């Protein structure tokens, strides 16, 4: 008898990616064979996102596509869209089971208990019941793992549904996360990215601090690199900056959400800082790590954003000179306070503002990468092979390419960095 086949379709953030990887391992332990997302499968698992209306639509389209391709397959949907609108998903033809984020850890059990296709079974819960912590880390990538350290968010920004989809901030104990990091190291991966919904808010459950976690992980043998996936500016404390600057394991790489360079818009968004505070945090990073990679999230087209507000945002970002911008047009989410705000920005205007910031990002990222031409740095090489080249990243997240050498996959090498190409990759020469 052929083993049953399962595939996974992960939408959204790296937190979802870590959870999908953990669910896949459970299916494999249960005798299933994991197949590619494009392959025919007996069970299709979708880990959904709901950060924007586009994410919801993408999930609905994926369900329909999978059902057309595999009409007999069991389709299971979990994640943030499933948490927020379970009945909407259950009504889509082909869906067999919908699980809340609280029930995500029971997905394998629920799926194998299904007797066949029929009316979709829905396991839902209210936001107040989102109290469980589904421990997760990714595996499969030969070089980098994503370790879930925190879940939920207490911030309730006016445009965001994640608090409703993920519940209150909570975490695993430091000791348990250290044990998971050791398990990752035993699997041969060299780099861990710490991920969560509001990663820097770590410790709400256990009374520990994020800096306590960083210090403990720093002692794990076998892991050579850590990156913090994202951290709110008001949580990027001086002691965290100083620790990352001093530790050879924590990369000089920070992803810090701004959302707007207008203090008026930040107030409407219910963010917890001003532009002055944000700029001060960036300056604090650069005082100790002048060459740090700083990525910034920004939303354009928020209700009430005037042309003057956008120009203020543009000029603020240009003055900060980050390495990269993650730019999002505002997406109205039902049930959020932003829905009722006046001054809706036409989509065409938001699209134009996105394009302007993308042009700024292209210039800033190119300038950041070009500054490394002619220098030496360490690079962790990945298994990707394209046009005879292999690729890896420096600690400050510049991508480097060298002629493919299988022996260098998952190795940290000293590299001389040469000229930058049109995609901002740096041509490297391995020195050791």
Regions found by a protein language model. Name each.
Residues 94, 245-252, 320-323:
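Glycine-enriched alpha-helix->loop->beta-strand junction motifs that scaffold or abut catalytic
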């Amino acid at each position: 008898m052929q083993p049953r086949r399962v595939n996974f379709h992960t939408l959204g953030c790296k937190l979802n990616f870590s959870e999908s990887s953990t669910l896949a391992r459970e299916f494999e332990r249960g005798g299933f064979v994991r197949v590619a997302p494009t392959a025919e499968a007996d069970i299709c698992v979708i880990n959904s996102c709901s950060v924007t209306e586009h994410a919801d639509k993408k999930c609905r389209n994926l369900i329909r596509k999978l059902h057309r391709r595999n009409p007999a397959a069991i389709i299971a949907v979990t994640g943030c869209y499933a948490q927020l609108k379970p009945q909407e998903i259950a009504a889509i033809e082909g869906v067999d089971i919908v699980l809340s984020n609280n029930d995500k850890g029971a997905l394998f059990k629920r799926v194998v208990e299904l007797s066949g296709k029929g009316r979709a079974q829905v396991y839902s819960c209210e936001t107040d019941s989102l109290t469980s912590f589904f421990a997760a880390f990714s595996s499969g990538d030969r070089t980098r793992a994503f370790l879930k350290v925190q879940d939920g968010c207490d911030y309730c920004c006016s445009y965001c549904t994640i608090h409703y989809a993920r519940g209150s901030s909570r975490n695993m104990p430091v000791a348990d996360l250290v044990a998971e990091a050791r398990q990752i190291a035993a699997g041969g991966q060299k780099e861990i990215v710490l991920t969560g919904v509001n990663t820097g808010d770590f410790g709400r459950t256990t009374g520990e601090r994020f800096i306590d976690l960083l210090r403990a992980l720093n002692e794990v043998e076998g892991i050579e690199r850590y990156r913090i996936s994202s951290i709110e500016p008001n949580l990027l404390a001086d002691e965290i900056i100083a620790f990352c600057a001093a530790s050879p394991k924590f990369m000089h790489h920070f992803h810090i959400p701004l959302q707007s360079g207008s203090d008026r818009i930040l107030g409407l968004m219910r963010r917890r800082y001003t532009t002055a505070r944000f700029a001060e945090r960036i300056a604090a990073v650069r005082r100790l790590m002048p060459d740090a990679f700083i990525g910034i999230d920004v939303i354009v087209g928020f209700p009430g954003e005037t042309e003057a507000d956008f120009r203020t945002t543009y000029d603020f970002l240009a003055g900060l000179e980050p390495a990269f911008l993650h730019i999002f047009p505002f997406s109205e989410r039902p049930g959020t306070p932003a829905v009722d705000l006046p001054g809706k920005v036409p989509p065409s205007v938001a699209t134009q503002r996105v394009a302007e910031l993308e042009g700024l990002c292209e210039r800033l990222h190119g300038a950041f990468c070009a500054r490394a031409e002619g220098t030496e740095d360490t690079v962790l090489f990945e298994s990707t092979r394209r046009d005879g080249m292999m690729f890896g990243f420096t600690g400050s997240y510049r991508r480097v390419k060298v002629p493919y050498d299988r022996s260098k996959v998952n190795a940290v090498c000293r590299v001389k960095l040469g000229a930058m190409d049109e995609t901002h990759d740096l041509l490297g020469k391995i020195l050791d």
